[in-house]
Amino acid sequence: MSPRPLKVAVTGAAGQIGYSLLFRLASGSLLGLDRPIELRLLEIEPALKALEGVVMELDDCAFLLLAGVEIGADPNKVFDGVNLALLVGARPRGPGMERGDLLEANGAIFTAQGKALNAVAAADIRVGVTGNPANTNALIAMTNAPDIPRERFSALTRLDHNRAIAQLATKTGSAVTDIRKMTIWGNHSATQYPDVFHAEIGGKNAAEVVGDQAWIEDYFIPTVAKRGAAIIDARGASSAASAASATIDAARDWLLGTPEGNWVSMAVVSDGSYGVPEGLISSFPVTTTDGDWTIVRGLGIDDFSRGRIDKSTAELADERMAVKQLGLI
């Protein structure tokens, strides 16, 4: 008897990240080759025609694991019974838009989606937010889903985590598989703090292997933090395939667990650990087991790291205050 299909919702499914994501999901990249997937795809009404074309392509791939596809514009229907919701769709910042305008536009989207998930999602729902500003969008969705445990919401900082590993591998001539215990702290924004001081390369402290504090401060941290802007500058469009890949990485490790002796970066609701204000959705080093995450405890934070973490969490606190003033949480 074949296992019950995992019902996976994807919002913004006709967008660039969605287009890169859906075929990976359907081919088994999330849970392997023995767990069928049922896709529930949400889009705004004007994009449903394009989404129909994407579904035609999914059909034409004849994926062995794809148990079904449903599409629609009503989150209360699309989210019905879903086990995993990947909230990819978000309003991009347009010309003349201030930060408050962006938060307000996305607030309406994630308020509605949070309420719909609260009403109709499966009891074991996990919610991953990729659409930016991801941390605060996740906070809005979480606040509007009071019956879903807060620990079931996470925002994507795995892309930053992966970018940091890639930069460190290039610098040291290492394989990405040699690098463990990378950490992204704070917001998925230019204030994020990629922390090499607890990372390891081949079992050795990464900062010591690099042996170049100036490179860490002046090149590594800004390169990781501003990588998205560099990609837009180079290709004329935002990172889509890498964001989709990181979305799958994050969901897979959340559901299946992190490897022994390693951790990953997830933006999750703070319990006050490491001085991050309680209730903020901030990135931490976490381990995962059976769909539950635990913040890694006991890491030493020096003055340099403390300043970086505090700067990013202050930005998150400002965003929380802004959406509170807008009545979104």
Swiss-Prot record:
Q: Name one GO biological process term.
A: malate metabolic process
Q: What does this protein do?
A: Catalyzes the reversible oxidation of malate to oxaloacetate.
| Recorded family membership | Belongs to the LDH/MDH superfamily. MDH type 2 family.
Q: What is this protein called?
A: Malate dehydrogenase
Output the InterPro entries linked to this UniProt entry.
L-lactate/malate_DH, Lactate/malate_DH_C, Lactate/malate_DH_N, Lactate_DH/Glyco_Ohase_4_C, Malate_DH_AS, Malate_DH_type2, NAD(P)-bd_dom_sf
Query: What UniProt keywords are attached to this protein's entry?
Result: NAD, Oxidoreductase, Tricarboxylic acid cycle
Give a yes or no for keyword Transmembrane helix in this entry.
no
PANTHER family in the record, alphabetically?
A: MALATE DEHYDROGENASE
The gene is mdh
Molecular function per GO: L-malate dehydrogenase (NAD+) activity
- Record's superkingdom? Bacteria
> Where does the record place the catalytic residues?
188
**HAMAP family in the cross-refs:** Malate_dehydrog_2
Binding locations of substrate: 93, 99, 132, 163
Spell out the PROSITE patterns in the cross-references: MDH
Q: Which reaction does it catalyse?
A: (S)-malate + NAD(+) = oxaloacetate + NADH + H(+)
What EC number(s) does its UniProt record assign?
Answer: 1.1.1.37
| Signal peptide location | none
Residues recorded as binding NAD(+), renumbered to this chain, are: 12-18, 106, 113, 130-132
